[in-house]
């Protein structure tokens, strides 16, 4: 009692340490295993935490084959896999493959150089230090939602993540956003018994909304089941509702709850603090997804900054393959570093 927690150090150095056990991080670990490299994955949540955080009744836009990893088939009951099916799939793949994953272990910093990285992490027992020859960051973006940046956004009735409709039954809910997450949440809330208003700054929701959701949403608006307030920018949030700026002037929208779903941006703290060079809001990357710090790679969403619409599990898998192929060649001494 009273003594500071000590930093526990893992003695063995691994060839590859992967930060993040989402689909792309797991894919990187699978490639490490296939290529004969020792690996360790550190994840601050559970395996496939990103998928776990999706709305409970969400259906993927991609077909099952496009989000499979490691050659393991994903069997879905419908034409598209559900959140639950994908979550169980990724966790079972990690289990069957015997991937070395430490969950509920948050990475705090990455230091060092190619061949001798030190990764500091924290679990419930305190801080731990890990050694690795190469580091692959696959932290994704779902834990870093975009914010409105307006007064009142931190009030307790304002949410930046949507799970399910049950807590909002019979209440006035304003959903802010115009893409998949917002439209899907609005429909789910309506069917769960909430009184829903969707607020969006554009003239209409984005045409990229999932093709099976868009006509459903349009029909609910036409029949008056969901109210759509377009060309509206949120100025402030109060305990009673939202102040909106519209072409016709300032307007107040009463709401018991406000769900802000305006997209996400890649988590970049680890990369920036490790000294990675950025081009605008995206890290500089080689064709093998190596950053400006030799031996430190970034794959999946974390390589795209705010442009999260350009990366999916499907192309993130290719990032992981390219990065691990390059790492394996260097570990074996087959290819000199450019």
What are these regions (language model features)?
Residues 134, 138-163, 248-286, 313:
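Glycine-rich beta-alpha-beta "Rossmann" dinucleotide-binding loop(s) and their flanking helix/strand
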Residues 25, 48, 109, 142-144, ...:
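Glycine-rich nucleotide phosphate-binding loop and flanking beta-alpha elements
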Residues 112-115, 125-213:
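Predominantly flavin-linked oxidoreductase catalytic cores and closely associated redox partners
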Residues 1, 10-14, 18-44, 161-206, ...:
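Rossmann-like dinucleotide/flavin-binding elements
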Residues 96-132, 191-280, 331, 335-338:
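A Rossmann-like FAD-binding core segment of flavoenzymes
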Residues 14-17, 21-99, 183-212, 279-280, ...:
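Beta1-alpha1 glycine-rich phosphate/pyrophosphate-binding loop at the start
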């Amino acid at each position: 009692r009273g003594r500071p927690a000590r930093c526990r150090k893992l003695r063995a150095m691994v060839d590859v340490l992967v930060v993040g056990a989402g689909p792309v991080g797991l894919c990187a670990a699978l490639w490490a295993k296939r290529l004969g490299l020792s690996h360790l994955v550190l994840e601050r949540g559970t395996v496939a935490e990103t998928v776990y955080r999706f709305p409970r009744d969400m259906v993927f836009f991609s077909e099952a084959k496009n989000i499979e990893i490691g050659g393991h088939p994903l069997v879905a009951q419908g034409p598209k896999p559900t959140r639950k099916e994908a979550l169980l799939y990724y966790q079972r793949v990690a289990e069957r493959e015997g991937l070395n994953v430490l969950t509920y272990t948050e990475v705090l910093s990455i230091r060092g150089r190619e061949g001798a990285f030190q990764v500091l992490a924290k679990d419930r027992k305190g801080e731990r230090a890990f050694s690795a020859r190469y580091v692959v960051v696959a932290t994704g973006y779902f834990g870093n939602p975009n914010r409105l940046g307006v007064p009142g956004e931190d009030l307790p009735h304002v949410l930046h993540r949507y799970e399910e409709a049950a807590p909002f039954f019979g209440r006035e809910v304003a959903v802010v956003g115009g893409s998949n997450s917002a439209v899907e949440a609005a429909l789910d809330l309506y069917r769960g018994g909430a009184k829903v208003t969707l607020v969006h700054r554009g003239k209409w929701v984005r045409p990229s909304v999932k093709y099976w959701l868009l006509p459903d949403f349009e029909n609910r608006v036409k029949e008056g089941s969901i109210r759509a307030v377009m060309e509206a920018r949120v100025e402030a949030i109060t305990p009673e509702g939202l102040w909106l700026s519209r072409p016709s002037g300032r307007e107040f929208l009463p709401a018991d709850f406000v769900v802000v779903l305006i997209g996400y941006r890649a988590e970049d703290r680890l990369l920036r603090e490790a000294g990675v060079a950025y081009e605008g809001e995206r890290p500089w990357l080689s064709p093998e997804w190596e950053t400006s710090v030799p031996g430190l790679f970034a794959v999946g969403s974390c390589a795209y900054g705010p442009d999260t619409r350009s990366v999916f599990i499907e192309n993130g898998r290719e990032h992981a393959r390219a990065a691990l192929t390059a790492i394996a060649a260097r570990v074996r001494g087959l290819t000199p570093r450019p």
